Amino acid sequence: MSNNNFQESSNNTSSPSKRSTPMLFLDAENKTQEALTTFELLNACTYQNKYVGSANVTTTATTSTKTSNSTSTKSHQQQHRRKLEYMTCDCEEEWDSELQMNLACGPDSNCINRITCVECVNRNCLCGDDCQNQRFQNRQYSKVKVIQTELKGYGLIAEQDIEENQFIYEYIGEVIDEISFRQRMIEYDLRHLKHFYFMMLSNDSFIDATEKGSLGRFINHSCNPNAFVDKWHVGDRLRMGIFAKRKISRGEEITFDYNVDRYGAQSQPCYCGEPNCIKFMGGKTQTDAALLLPQMIAEALGVTPRQEKAWLKENKSIRNQQQNDESNINEEFVNSIEIEPIENQDGVTKVMSALMKTQHPLIIKKLIERIFLSNDQDDINVMFVRFHGYKTISTILQDLLVAKNSGKESETTDNNDIDNSTGDDDQDKDELIIKILKILVSWPAVTKNKIASANLEEVVKDIQTNNENSNNNDEINQLCTSLLDRWSKLEMAYRIPKQESVPTNNAAAAATTTATATGTTTSASPFERISSHTPEVGGTNTPSSTSQQQQQQNSRDAGLPENWRSAFDKNTGGYYYYNLVTKETTWERPLGSLPLGPKPPSGPGLKGRINKYNEIDLAKREELRIQKEKEMKFIEMQNRDRKLKELIEMSKKSMNNIGGSSGTTITAATINGLSDNGGNNNGNITGIYGDDKHSKHHHHHHDKHLKNGPRNTSTSSSSGNNVEKIWKRIFAKYIPNIIKKYESEIGRDNVKGCAKELVNILTQSEIKHGNSLPSSSSSNGYSMELSDKKLKKIKEYSHGYMDKFLIKFNNSKKHKSTMGSKGSDNHKRKHNGDGDNGVKRSKV
């Protein structure tokens, strides 16, 4: 393995004509246990201090020259940005009662957090706890193993197929600052260590996995990689993940482009063997290929790697003369890019994602210019606000302000977030600030919520104050005044306060990131969720005030609908209401409540509270309207579910009376008569290991089997339910990916329905045959992974199931005119015992 001193992977795509057929190491010996002895395994990154790796800190570095030996030294100053609320998505919780999991924020959900590389955090998003956008926190790694390569040392290969964009592994290690990074480079060189494992996390934060890390450290470099590295916001930390660039086959080595930095690294040969191999990595002279823009940045700027390569070929002499030796991009090429306005949502997401990740001042300047050119398009402006625009702009403005202030304190600056490394002076920064302020003027603002959560008012005030104390640019003053005046007239659409993030102290950081970052936290119950964000009753701890507030709360609870409770919010001096089951919250008494009696006399102590309540009364009315809409939607869903259950029960009774049950569960699609009339009894679902000749008598012999079956088991009904849930979780991990390819033919809803039914069928089959859970050496005694042999059988059965479903799905389109006669036809099939074995699934 070559010298792993790398920054965020460029994810550049080579020409398809150059892509070679991947080599498979299916018979390679598993060296994982041997490799684990060469380093200390970590489950999460450790942090040198509370500043490194933080999303809320900007670091400035100033240089000073020693006259005695003419050598320069660096001093670093960490400055906290204003604390921002967690970035939240606007998805809604999508609880699946069968799978017992929250399906919100999945890969096809259009979740704004997932699109912009931000993980959702429990109790801070409307999507509910334990959504599908928590891969870092839950350590949802792909199945891999370590092997010994011929020339590169250890390598990592896939033990199962990995889909495009699938999360493979987190790059874990010790997060250190730049001073420690440079010291360790020298130390490791003196110790004659052959392999270094550094990765740049931010301008002053590096992950060192040399002595402590995870299996991700064994992924080798390739000039034509099948994976890429991406930076994600997880809580208040930045974390690096490795993702599949394309589909990776089982047995294929996982690689990504190191995009080697130059911090004294020795030049080393590259052994990737690809046709486009650059032959050497590192060293004093960086190759053009290593300086290519990351694909994510190139797309955000509206260019392609091919355009950049063509420019380099034509202007190589210019680049060699003018390129900054410390830069890791082709600056002259970036300067030459003619920026164009953004045309659609895809462009917005690419620009915002790049803006949230990059720290290079020239890239930031170009991206801001692109947003500025698009600020006359109302629909584009709305999208920018939705995709965390205010919080991202707030961060950039704070970094600009820090850079300006650090420039005043020293004669030179070096390597801060928005610095002078590209020749920018205060005038250039002022021009950039003016563009950003004009962008903010053009963005729509209906309520103050997003502006307040981004602390933009305070940031703009800081800019105005700084401007008045320095060059006093009139345009900046006018724009700041205009924005502050406009924002001051906005109302807050009040929300229940979110749980504040707990700062990570040094001791905790030495062991793990945060409680959620370890991936070992469990989902809180509805009661725990409510108690976690419910303010204390009353504002003091005296017995009298507590008793008085408790009496008021009890009187408010009287007459509330079932499962509703009230709680006092000391921040506003008012009561809000929450539902223990649905987790709905509202400031107004829920629908169906009995009216409250006369209010008690208000004493002097309540005066301030009442006045504060009246100040936000208009905002609460708007909130009430939204909450009522949610209530009506929830009641509608309850009524629909109740009717559906009644129809299912009626159908089951009629099936039992007829005596022709096929041993399958009647689906919602069957009840609604959305399937076709035809079909043979070829879809038996009683097992995945072969045809069950007695499938038609499954229910007939079920009770007898229970009575005469073995009684030497100690498993209770509750443990049986637990086993069933575990099987469902195991199958739910595989089935959606297996049948995802059918989505283009039958639609997402039908694929989702088929996945649920397949999970149910396979689970019941395992329980019926008495198969034990996959064994594991873990503390829970079972594994979530299936053997290759079993997985192959499941795939074969699933594809057969879907083939039958496709036939019936296509036939149903041809026979829409005969749908009216379906009831009698279905009755005949049931009477004759010729069912469809549950392979029908359509959108309900």
From Swiss-Prot:
GO CC aspect terms: chromatin; cytosol; nucleus
EC class (word): transferase
Record keywords, A-Z: Chromosome, Methyltransferase, Nucleus, Repressor, S-adenosyl-L-methionine, Transcription, Transcription regulation, Transferase
Record's catalysed reaction(s): L-lysyl(36)-[histone H3] + 3 S-adenosyl-L-methionine = N(6),N(6),N(6)-trimethyl-L-lysyl(36)-[histone H3] + 3 S-adenosyl-L-homocysteine + 3 H(+)
Ranges of residues in domain Post-SET: 266-282
Biased amino acid composition, Basic and acidic residues: 832-844
One example GO MF annotation: RNA binding
Pfam families, per database record: AWS (PF17907), SET (PF00856), SRI (PF08236), WW (PF00397)
Domain spans labelled WW: 558-592
Database matches in Gene3D superfamilies: 2.20.70.10, SET domain, Set2, Rpb1 interacting domain
Domain of life: Eukaryota
Region listing for Disordered, in residue ranges: 1-21, 501-565, 689-721, 812-844
A GO biological process held by the record: transcription-coupled nucleotide-excision repair
All copies of domain SET, residue ranges: 142-259
SUPFAM superfamilies: SET domain (SSF82199), WW domain (SSF51045)
Domain AWS: 84-140
Family assignment from sequence similarity: Belongs to the class V-like SAM-binding methyltransferase superfamily. Histone-lysine methyltransferase family. SET2 subfamily.
Domain observations: The AWS and SET domains are necessary for transcription repression.
Protein name: Histone-lysine N-methyltransferase, H3 lysine-36 specific
Organism this protein belongs to: Candida albicans (strain SC5314 / ATCC MYA-2876) (Yeast)
